[in-house]
Amino acid sequence: MKFLAIFLVGLASLFASGASAQEKVGVVLMHGKQGGGPRDGSLESLHRKMQEAGMLVIKPEMPWSFGRYIEGNWGLAMAEIGAHIQKLKETGATRVVLVGHSLGSPAALSYAARHPGAVHALALLAPGHIPYYYSQCIPFSPIRMCGVKDAVERARKEVDAGNADKKQSHTDINQGRASPVWMTARDYLTYFDPASDAEMSVTAPKIAPNVPVLWVIGDRDYLIREGRQYVFDKLPANSKSQYLEVAANHMTAPAVAADQIVNWLKSAALP
C-alpha cells in the first residue's frame, strides 16, 4: 500500500508537470507615456529576456505613445489590448499576462478589472499616471503641480457646456514636467479624472483574487514615497503577488529587474 501511495503521488506530479509544460505564456508588453517606437529602449532588455524564456510577446504601440499621444479615449486603449490578447491566443498562448511600464500599468490593471478571467497575471513596472495625485497637486512633488487638476475642472465645464467632443489643448504631467495634450474634453476625462478607470487605486480592488500582481518600483522613483498603501495593498490577497523595490529610477526599473520579472512570470502565470 505504501508503494502504491508513493506511485500515485509521483504519477500525479508527472501529470501536473506535463500540463504545465504544455502551457504557453503570452505577454502584452506595454510602454509608458510618450514611449514606444525606436526611440524608446526602456523595455528592450526585458523584451529580449521574455523571448529567451520562451514567452510569446507582443510589444505594441499604444494610444499614449510618442507618435499617437494621446489618441482616443480610455476605452480605445482597452479595445486595443483585447485585440493583442486575441492575437496571442491565435499564435498559441494559453496563459495571458499583461505587463505595463508607467502608464502601461494602469492600463493593465484596468483591462483585468473590466475583463475578469481574461488574464492570468499582471506585472506593473514603475507604475505611473496618477489621476488621484494629480487632483491633489502631486503632494510628494518638490513643488505643487496643479495643471492637471485645473485642466480636469475645465474639461468638466466644457462637457457641461456642450463642448465635450471639441478637440482642444489640455494639460498632462509626465515625470514632473507639464505638457499639452490635444484631446476632446470627453476623452481627456477618461484618462485624467481621478474617479476614472485610469486611476490605479480605483481598479485595484476590482482585480479577480486569482490574478497575481507584481509591483516593481525603483528606489529613485517619486512614487515610492507612497509605498504599498496607494495601490498594492488595495489588491485582493494572492500568495503569488509581490511588491518589489529595486535600485533604479522610473525609466531603468524594467531593465534592472528584468531577470526577477521573468522568473516571477514563469511561476505566477502558470496554474
Regions found by a protein language model. Name each.
Residues 207-209, 215-217:
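Short beta-strand/loop motif that positions the catalytic acidic residue
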Residues 87, 95-151:
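Primarily recognizes the serine-hydrolase "nucleophile elbow" in alpha/beta-hydrolase
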Residues 242-271:
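Catalytic active-site module of serine/aspartate enzymes centered on a nucleophile-bearing elbow/loop
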Residues 33-34, 218-222, 247-249:
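Acidic beta-to-alpha connecting loop that harbors the catalytic carboxylate
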Residues 222-228, 253:
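Conserved alpha/beta-hydrolase "acid-adjacent" motif
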Residues 23-53, 61-64:
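Short, surface-exposed "cap/lid" segments of acyl-processing enzymes
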